[in-house]
Amino acid sequence: LLGVDTPETSSANNPSEYGLRDSLENRECLSKYALEAKSFTSKFVQRETIEISTDSDADRRGDYGRLLAYVDTVEGENLNARLLESGYARVYSSEFSKRKKFNSLEETAMENDRGLWSCD
């Protein structure tokens, strides 16, 4: 997903990537929200129709060769943004056209201790 980074479900999380102190409690907290992000994403993409789009301001592929894209419903709901709003992801440190909006969504989630921002 373009512009967002969720905690890992299959490997250890590094709390410092999320601005959190490194502790067992925070690693466990991030693992919990990794599973919630996975469930949220699964439900989102199981809708009848979703659209995938790339961004001309961003690289098409990430460090692991994965396609980087926005995922939207036909009604215009954006998965990437919803993950940030819910506190299931952080803004990724790359260039893309929705960065300003995504930063704002992340900041609001942090201020309201949503999702992973309630860790620590």
Q: Where in this protein do the model-derived segments appear?
A:
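Flexible, acidic/histidine-containing loops and adjacent segments that form or flank the divalent-metal
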Residues: 119
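Electropositive
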Residues: 1-85
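Conserved beta-structured recognition patch
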Residues: 63-116
